[in-house]
């Protein structure tokens, strides 16, 4: 038995927005030897007209998972609400600070308190340390070249409390320039130091101590008295002769008030001449008459009356 089937209704194509519907084919059976009758296929079938079906679509709305209260609040804070014109709605941004102090405000306040405490401590330190007055600073000249800042401080400690002691050195040679500065704690101690150490003998050299000049002022120089008739110039003296040896040499001819060998400030070496002041004119004349042209350690010295500086500057 053979069976042939044909679809009664052909599927038809619809429009783009229409649905495609196809009906199941109905089978018609033909037999050669035997025929089978089906009650529901006994009648002839008529074609079925299809109605034009329209199909519309709408976006699907998926409901998200249930959010926790914390995540919902975070999303709400980070969401911008736009009005119909595309402008940002400011309702979410208009908020008033709560009465509780924020972390940032607390940090700023803590920093402010720390700054105030630092200022108070700095003020207390300034009150404890007071800079010595300018009038307590002294100039010390004609220092021996082997005296350093520490030795200068120890020397002036006998007059009071030494705040600062400094010997000035040459930058190139790193040798003492023969002078320095000492700052005492009070003006009274500075005045006492001037009385004690001005014309004070240190290693054969007489110190010059007076008040140092203030900032912007010229150094104060004490008035000098030149005893022209008693002051002697001594030239061509040997390099190894110091103040003490020069004084000893002239003391054989009278009372020596002062004896000084002139040294180079840069190198600290003797310049080969000096000055001697005798107590009287007679003693000065006797020393010149006996010592001029004499040999001293292999060198012939020159001895004569020292020239007055005031008269020398007039030429």
From Swiss-Prot:
InterPro entries: Euk_RNA-bind_prot, Nucleotide-bd_a/b_plait_sf, RBD_domain_sf, RRM2_NsCP33-like, RRM_dom. It comes from the Eukaryota. SUPFAM superfamilies: RNA-binding domain, RBD. It is found in: Plastid, Chloroplast. Residues 136-214, 230-308 form the RRM domain. Residues 115-133 have a biased composition (Acidic residues). Residues 1-71 form a transit peptide. Pfam families: RRM_1 (PF00076). Its main location: plastid. Residues 114-133 are annotated as: Disordered. Keywords: Chloroplast, mRNA processing, Plastid, Repeat, Ribonucleoprotein, RNA-binding, Transit peptide. One of its GO terms (biological process) is chloroplast rRNA processing. One of its GO terms (molecular function) is mRNA binding. GO terms for cellular component: chloroplast thylakoid membrane; ribonucleoprotein complex. Could be involved in splicing and/or processing of chloroplast RNA's. This is 31 kDa ribonucleoprotein, chloroplastic. It comes from Nicotiana sylvestris (Wood tobacco).
